[in-house]
Regions:
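Cytochrome P450 heme-thiolate "Cys pocket" and heme-binding signature region
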Residues: 160-161, 177, 181, 346, ...
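Cytochrome P450 substrate-recognition site 1
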Residues: 74-94, 99-194, 198, 218, ...
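Cytochrome P450 heme-thiolate monooxygenase catalytic core
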Residues: 146-152, 156, 190-360, 376
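Conserved cytochrome P450 K-helix/beta-meander segment immediately N-terminal to the heme-binding cysteine loop
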Residues: 444-471
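C-terminal helix/juxtamembrane-tail motif
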Residues: 530-550
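Cytochrome P450 heme-binding "Cys pocket" and the immediately downstream C-terminal segment
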Residues: 371-374, 442, 493-530
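N-terminal targeting/anchor module and adjacent flexible "hinge" preceding the catalytic domain
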Residues: 1-123, 130, 134, 147-156, ...
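Conserved cytochrome P450 K-helix E-x-x-R motif and the immediately C-terminal K′/meander segment
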Residues: 90-111, 293, 390-432
Length: 550
């Protein structure tokens, strides 16, 4: 066995590592061998250089008298770039309040990976699908681990398992075994009647607003609508959100929404701020305790069966998630421990309605801002025999192809999710030659991936028909990730899509939506998700519908 010295181009040759190389090794195997020594994530990008000359054969590499430089995708290794920032404050005032616009500016300046520092916390951002796929993969390089600096660190909840817990825990393994069946495609189908009853129950409120000739702010009503369904299906609770026009959101809904806003404020100020015994950090802790108390109370009150059921059968028959969690049994007779039921349900409740209410708001935004969308959606409903009494199910939804494209395009251009971060497990070299230290928090920036001009033709244009194009059908893996991707992607995506694809047809068929207030639509930079703050619309009862397309 012979040996050769290798070093990372961009570093001193004096740091070269001597590596034993087996005889008769081919170039691909040599790349993998070198990658293992230097923690290079993707061996395919490795090249070899001596004195500015690229070496393309193993014999040339092994016969070199000089140490061999390693390039990554033709580049020398380098640190991740980013703005320098101010002492202590870092880049806070370069990022906030318009973090979407400012991050786009930084991507344009620094490229597909950059870092920012806010009040001592360093965070990395990428709009590159290749890097995002690596980051989202639970691997030797990355995992979901909520350390200081992670956007969810102040509300980390080990007992929850999903969303707010680390992957490398028994709690996550247990929750990930029991919860996904309740959110699978078959399980979600049997939630459809409750979802439909929820939106139909809201009609009396929207009808009254129409009779008053009154405009309304979309997000607060979509928050009430989304959470009304989640309250019934997860906790077995009726939040009574549509008993009147001015019915207030249930305390649990307000507390969860408050906690997401407070968490964003706390994380933007750095990890030290989260430890303060007063102010927003204390309010955040108090909100979490109150939410836990209310969920425990709802668990005791929720309608529950008495017979244990197999996971899949329980998912298809349980009245609500409380019922499911108590009765579901795996093939070894194990159940979700009673003391681990409350925390996952808190997460399922909060994540369930905050995401769908934001998405519903953007879907209505599209109806009143982008010409022709509302008319095409309505025509598709009419062409499929839709009327006031139509029962929406998965079979009907599958026929509504324009609805599917409209939802996809809304999730591309106006995706509510913002910070699905992961943490590096080791020092590594990423594609592009970026050196990333261990315990780095990396955020695949979904909004900026979905609006990346290198991935999408004219991404600023809202165009549902792009989803019929060959380019979009053959788009790079990782270029459309509305619910993230990988083992820790959102487990509730089937639920969310079923909900919005049930609510929106019912609303569009009954009402004609128009924009009631001119001016730019603003988002709340201090909320965990991207939602429109000042979208006011009128919803007028339809009195006529178009004829079926001949």
């Amino acid at each position: 066995m012979t040996s050769q010295k290798f070093y990372l181009l961009g570093e001193s040759p004096s740091l070269a590592e001597e590596i034993d190389v087996p005889p008769h090794i081919d170039e691909e195997s040599l790349r993998h061998l070198v990658a293992s020594y230097f923690a290079i994530v993707d061996p395919k990008g490795i090249g070899f250089v001596v004195q500015d000359v690229c070496l393309t054969t193993v014999s040339d590499i092994m016969s070199s008298d000089d140490a061999v430089g390693i390039t990554i995708d033709g580049k020398a290794v380098r640190g991740v770039p980013g703005p320098q920032g101010l002492p202590y404050i870092g880049n806070y005032f370069e990022v906030y309040p318009d973090h979407l616009g400012n991050h786009q500016r930084l991507f344009e300046k620094y490229g597909p990976l950059f870092k920012t520092t806010n009040m001592g916390s360093v965070v990395y951002h990428t709009n590159d699908p290749t890097l995002s796929n690596i980051v989202f993969g639970e691997s030797d390089f990355f995992t979901k681990k909520l350390i200081e600096g992670h956007p969810l660190y102040p509300i980390k909840n080990k007992e929850a398992g999903v969303f707010l817990g680390d992957t490398d825990t028994e709690e996550w393994k247990t929750a990930h075994k029991f919860l996904p069946p309740a959110f699978g495609p078959k399980a979600v189908r049997h939630y459809a009647p409750t979802m439909q009853m929820t939106v139909e129950d809201s009609f009396k409120v929207f009808d009254e607003l129409d009779e008053r000739d009154e405009a309304w702010n979309v997000y607060p009503y979509m928050l009430k609508l989304g959470s009304q369904a989640v309250g019934k299906l997860v906790l077995g609770m009726d939040f009574k959100h549509f008993t009147s026009v001015d019915a207030p959101p249930h305390e649990m809904v307000m507390r969860i929404a408050e906690s997401l806003s407070l968490n964003k404020k706390v994380t933007s100020m750095g990890s030290w701020y989260a430890m303060l015994p007063f102010g927003d950090p204390k309010r955040l802790r108090d909100a979490r305790w109150r939410i836990a108390d209310m969920v425990n109370e709802s668990i005791e009150r929720a309608s529950k069966g008495v017979v244990n059921l197999d996971l899949q059968e329980a998912a298809l028959t349980a009245e609500n998630m409380v019922d499911y969690c108590i009765r579901a049994t795996d093939n070894k007779g194990n159940k979700l421990p009673r003391d681990r039921i409350m925390e996952p349900l808190v997460v399922a409740t909060g994540a369930g309605f905050t995401t769908t209410s934001s998405l519903l708001s953007w879907l209505i935004y599209g109806l009143v801002v982008y010409p022709g969308m509302q008319e095409r959606l309505l025509q598709e409903l009419v062409d499929n025999g839709f009327d006031e009494g139509t029962k929406i199910d998965a079979d009907l939804i599958n026929k509504l192809t324009f609805l599917d494209k409209y939802v996809k395009e809304t999730q591309r251009k106006h995706n509510p999710s913002y910070q699905p971060a992961r943490t590096s497990k080791v020092d590594m070299i990423l594609p592009g030659g970026y050196k990333l230290p261990k315990d780095s928090v990396v955020i695949p920036a979904i909004h900026h991936i979905h609006n990346n001009t290198e991935l999408w033709d004219n991404p600023a244009r809202f165009d549902p028909d792009r989803w019929d194009s060959e380019k979009v059908k053959t788009r790079p893996n990782g270029s459309y990730i509305p619910f993230a991707t990988g083992p820790r992607m959102c487990i509730g995506f089937n639920f969310a899509l079923m909900e919005v694809k049930t609510f929106l047809p019912k609303l569009v068929y009954r009402y004609r939506f128009t924009l009631a207030k001119d001016g730019p639509i603003e988002y709340d930079p201090m909320f965990q998700l991207i939602r429109p703050n000042n979208l006011y619309v009128r919803a007028e009862r339809r009195v006529k519908w178009p004829p079926k397309t001949e």
